[in-house]
Amino acid sequence: MLTPIIRKFQYGQHTVTIETGMMARQATAAVMVSMDDTAVFVTVVGQKKAKPGQSFFPLTVNYQERTYAAGRIPGSFFRREGRPSEGETLTSRLIDRPIRPLFPDSFLNEVQVIATVVSVNPQINPDIVALIGASAALSLSGIPFNGPIGAARVGFINDQYVLNPTTDELKESRLDLVVAGTAGAVLMVESEADILSEDQMLGAVVFGHEQQQVVIENINALVAEAGKPKWDWHAEPVNEALHARVAELAAARLGDAYRITEKQERYTQVDAIKADVTEALLAQDDTLDAAEIQDILGSVEKDVVRSRVLRGEPRIDGREKDMIRGLDVRTGVLPRTHGSALFTRGETQALVTATLGTARDAQNIDELMGERTDSFLLHYNFPPYSVGETGMVGSPKRREIGHGRLAKRGVLAVMPSPSEFPYTVRVVSEITESNGSSSMASVCGASLALMDAGVPIKAAVAGIAMGLVKEDENFVVLSDILGDEDHLGDMDFKVAGSRDGITALQMDIKIEGITREIMQVALNQAKGARLHILGVMEQAISTPRGDISEFAPRIYTMKINPEKIKDVIGKGGSVIRALTDETGTTIEIEDDGTIKIAATDGDKAKHAIRRIEEITAEIEVNRIYAGKVTRIVDFGAFVAIGGGKEGLVHISQIADKRVDKVTDYLQMGQEVPVKVIEVDRQGRIRLSMKEATTPDAEAPAPEAAE
């Protein structure tokens, strides 16, 4: 008899249920977590032994959405789920980031977390549910894990923080922030904001962390009731004698190497020192393990860099703690792109382009939460040459997808609305050099490229990456961190925004004990750095260009009676196809009668507008039109008039005398004046040639069919 153990609690406006012991009993641990009909099944499997020679912690997190969760069948050819979507990849990273620092440093056993969305309420995003599930499953598993963690989404509506807002509430929110952490510390923040102040952002982080304590308390209670025994795992004892010997041989030399400001030269010197020390020690004692020596060298290297920062000495590249690397900002660097910029900050460089397209270029995204269209795309590419390496080039990896989304969050708040700027915009950031903070360089480059393209963004935005080195109560916050400072430090803290406030905030914290005071210092220091960068950017381009590129499509908007849409489209799309071929434009029609005409040539667009006006013009009875014979039948002829509308000239209306054969008077393609004598209820048009040729007849209408 399967007997589940269930924990249920109120979490803000939602009810959360955590259930274990019912499913996947061969996994190390498994839980089903639900929040108001959104349910995620999370499993954890950990290997009891590490693989021989394992040098890193092999943690994998897979978040996967099943379409049956929303009562749908996949639309793919094979009618089953395929490779992870961008959203699934981002949520996998969201789960990975706060749990990874909570495993012991020397724990190298393989661990896999799989979160499967099995039921979805469109109002409840599964990501928070999956985070809670991963925390609960790891805590129940007995695997060495310094959790549990809680997770919360925070909105900001009517100047009030809202815990776990629904999908509809998020549409009204000026903030979408996810925070995760243990009982005593924030570990991860991911957010986008509509230009909020530093205090408002910090308040949201603290609010979310306080509110998620109920999650941690309930997971602890569940572990007390159903948790598996803790693994009998102990870290390998540190060889203190070897550590001292390595430090004696390497510390001073590594200290000198870390005074070399150029990255590649520094890396070459550090590698040479490590090779020399390893070789020397193995020559003295060939029973030593080279891998262990390398690990200790890494630890010594970290101690050297961190201790110098804490003593207030200059950083690796000679800067003070709050200094920004040298900036070089250029726009319009590529002649045929719609907008381009080259942003360089020290040894980090991004070549960023902006491309304008029409509504049909927008991305249609079919998600579990529903379908949507995205008219602002930002893609980030990190080729291996950017760090002087060789490697695979192909589809974007998890890191590239995550960095691209962060850069997009930084820019999204200043993008114009579709009514203000009816273009699809694609920004691509090519990282050509990297030594820290390439995602924030992408934010700066995106802002510049958009202004160069003439996109009327509300304000320029810039991004900065902050770091932290902390020992006991002593801490130093670093501005514009290098790659090494990111790797050897305790926090990666990225902030993007305009002069007026923050648009995106991302934090990844590797240690506990990050207080509100430390986060406040980091945010204020980041603001100073952001304003400095914006000042330099404004010297290159301070406002969006007054006009878009000559190579970009120009979009003209007109409005017609919605009842006339069928006339513009024509049977099977025949009219609109003929129009686009004839005018060389792209034409998009919306349900409310709005028509968008895109063309690189203004004259072509005007021609298309004129033709649409002809097609949608009301046919006036008793008016004379210039027409063209399109079909001849026994009882008369069909004649196209204004805008391609077709009417019938009955055989009795061709001439004043009796007509025996229509072809005696008319030929296919012949142009003739006709008078509208009736439009019936079905819209059928009766025409007359003989009334159009009477002495008192008016001249044909000038806007007749061409």
Curated annotation (Swiss-Prot):
Ranges for domain KH come to: 553-612
How does the annotation summarize its subunit structure?
A: Component of the RNA degradosome, which is a multiprotein complex involved in RNA processing and mRNA degradation.
Class in the EC hierarchy, top level: transferase
A Pfam family per the record? KH_1
Summarizing the function annotation, the protein's role is: Involved in mRNA degradation. Catalyzes the phosphorolysis of single-stranded polyribonucleotides processively in the 3'- to 5'-direction.
Q: GO terms for biological process?
A: mRNA catabolic process; RNA processing
What's this protein's name?
Answer: Polyribonucleotide nucleotidyltransferase
Q: Which cofactor does it need?
A: Mg(2+)
Q: Which gene encodes it?
A: pnp
Q: Which reaction does it catalyse?
A: RNA(n+1) + phosphate = RNA(n) + a ribonucleoside 5'-diphosphate
Q: Does the keyword Nucleotidyltransferase apply?
A: yes
What EC number(s) has UniProt assigned to this enzyme?
Answer: 2.7.7.8
Residues that coordinate or bind Mg(2+): 486, 492
Citing just one GO molecular function, the answer is: polyribonucleotide nucleotidyltransferase activity
- The S1 motif domain sits at 622-690
